[in-house]
Amino acid sequence: MVLSQRQRDELNRAIADYLRSNGYEEAYSVFKKEAELDMNEELDKKYAGLLEKKWTSVIRLQKKVMELESKLNEAKEEFTSGGPLGQKRDPKEWIPRPPEKYALSGHRSPVTRVIFHPVFSVMVSASEDATIKVWDYETGDFERTLKGHTDSVQDISFDHSGKLLASCSADMTIKLWDFQGFECIRTMHGHDHNVSSVAIMPNGDHIVSAARDKTIKMWEVQTGYCVKTFTGHREWVRMVRPNQDGTLIASCSNDQTVRVWVVATKECKAELREHEHVVECISWAPESSYSSISEATGSETKKSGKPGPFLLSGSRDKTIKMWDVSTGMCLMTLVGHDNWVRGVLFHSGGKFILSCADDKTLRVWDYKNKRCMKTLNAHEHFVTSLDFHKTAPYVVTGSVDQTVKVWECR
């Protein structure tokens, strides 16, 4: 690229200013002589710091160009594969698209968890305002509020039929609700601190919970009795989730580990440690994703001939990790969020991962290529939770901005 005489003169003066102001006196005097510069104070002021300014603005522009290029590639991909003009996408590849279909407000404090009902077109949100709210995600209508907890509701879980809802709270209790009559039918006491997570086991007759008292407990639905306590985490247990058949449970903690427990014996089958900060969330891979995962990670099929099980974890270290539970190996780390990762799960088609974080975004990852393929600026504040409907094309998110948003996938 050829510079004009004026540009060359400006560049020379800026270089001379840089050499002089950074103490390269000898180089400055040689350069000044060779470039035939007559420096004077008036001119000097004009060129003070000019080289640094140009340099930083070039870097800034480069970054912007790269961002725009990646957005352009994303748009091209959409155009060829999923836009109204291209081929219709297979529902297995539908992903959430902005803008949101509904932004639902009603909670008076941050939303802590959002989940879909397994049968009806409703979803449920829990909040630090001590309430649970029920919404119709197809119409955006608010349906009702469940009241009973006296402090922040931290987590909620349906049984497979959707007739029972379990909730847990910073008030140290777990409540079981009849979701047909919307009545609280049982309250379970036993944890000594904030109960941060709850899940109804796949068979529907037990509930697992995790708390800041460092324990995981298992409760009988019928009686409300605590029948097992799993100990091993050294700090606050953030989340607990059973696998599909209920033989294993996974938990994650402030101690920066993910643990997998055998339900029958209470033994810790695996302790997964590679995160460098609190692990906020975990999610089991559905069997529909096993072949994609094996292909993406080259994890060889074991002697039993069955791959997996696989687990996802999201952490305050801003990363998402995928684990092979049988070997305890971390298969991949997804980097892209700019803040704590608060929710992570597999797309029901098995090819993608969805996550949400305190960087206010909802992201879709193509894990085969270890890249973030879509970023949605989802909320005005931290995104605390997300859920993906098993059969309908919807994603729901909850946030510290007190809203719940419904996103349509296509």
Curated annotation (Swiss-Prot):
Biological process annotations from GO: brain morphogenesis; cell division; establishment of mitotic spindle orientation; germ cell development; lipid catabolic process; microtubule organizing center organization; microtubule sliding; nuclear migration
Start-end of each WD repeat: 106-147, 148-187, 190-229, 232-271, 274-333, 336-377, 378-410
Chain ranges of the LisH domain: 7-39
GO molecular function: dynein complex binding; microtubule plus-end binding; protein heterodimerization activity
Interaction with NDE1, as annotated region: 1-66
Region (Interaction with NDEL1): 1-102, 388-410
Location of the protein in the cell: Cytoplasm, Cytoskeleton; Cytoplasm, Cytoskeleton, Microtubule organizing center, Centrosome; Cytoplasm, Cytoskeleton, Spindle; Nucleus membrane
GO cellular component: 1-alkyl-2-acetylglycerophosphocholine esterase complex; axon cytoplasm; centrosome; cytoplasmic microtubule; kinetochore; microtubule associated complex; neuron projection; neuronal cell body
Region: Required for self-association and interaction with PAFAH1B2 and PAFAH1B3, residue numbers: 1-38
Pfam families, per database record: LisH_PAC1 (PF24951), WD40 (PF00400)
Nucleotidyltransferase is among the record's keywords: no
InterPro entries per record: Dynein_regulator_LIS1 (IPR017252), G-protein_beta_WD-40_rep (IPR020472), LIS1_N (IPR037190), LisH (IPR006594), PAC1-like_LisH-like_dom (IPR056795), WD40/YVTN_repeat-like_dom_sf (IPR015943), WD40_repeat_CS (IPR019775), WD40_repeat_dom_sf (IPR036322)
PROSITE patterns, A to Z: LISH, WD_REPEATS_1, WD_REPEATS_2, WD_REPEATS_REGION
Positions where N6-acetyllysine occurs in the chain: K53
SUPFAM superfamilies per record: Lissencephaly-1 protein (Lis-1, PAF-AH alpha) N-terminal domain, WD40 repeat-like
Ranges where the record places region Interaction with dynein and dynactin: 83-410
Keyword annotations: Acetylation, Cell cycle, Cell division, Coiled coil, Cytoplasm, Cytoskeleton, Developmental protein, Differentiation, Lipid degradation, Lipid metabolism, Membrane, Microtubule, Mitosis, Neurogenesis, Nucleus, Phosphoprotein, Repeat, Transport, WD repeat
Region ranges (Interaction with DCX): 367-409
Domain of life, per lineage: Eukaryota
Functional description taken from the UniProt entry: Regulatory subunit (beta subunit) of the cytosolic type I platelet-activating factor (PAF) acetylhydrolase (PAF-AH (I)), an enzyme that catalyzes the hydrolyze of the acetyl group at the sn-2 position of PAF and its analogs and participates in PAF inactivation. Regulates the PAF-AH (I) activity in a catalytic dimer composition-dependent manner. Positively regulates the activity of the minus-end directed microtubule motor protein dynein. May enhance dynein-mediated microtubule sliding by targeting dynein to the microtubule plus end.
Remaining remarks: Originally the subunits of the type I platelet-activating factor (PAF) acetylhydrolase was named alpha (PAFAH1B1), beta (PAFAH1B2) and gamma (PAFAH1B3). Now these subunits have been renamed beta (PAFAH1B1), alpha2 (PAFAH1B2) and alpha1 (PAFAH1B3) respectively.
Domain notes: Dimerization mediated by the LisH domain may be required to activate dynein.
Subunit structure: Can self-associate. Component of the cytosolic PAF-AH (I) heterotetrameric enzyme, which is composed of PAFAH1B1 (beta), PAFAH1B2 (alpha2) and PAFAH1B3 (alpha1) subunits. The catalytic activity of the enzyme resides in the alpha1 (PAFAH1B3) and alpha2 (PAFAH1B2) subunits, whereas the beta subunit (PAFAH1B1) has regulatory activity. Trimer formation is not essential for the catalytic activity.
Protein's name according to its UniProt entry: Platelet-activating factor acetylhydrolase IB subunit alpha
Organism: Sus scrofa (Pig)
Highest classification ranks of the organism: Eukaryota, Metazoa, Chordata, Craniata, Vertebrata
Gene name, Swiss-Prot/TrEMBL: PAFAH1B1
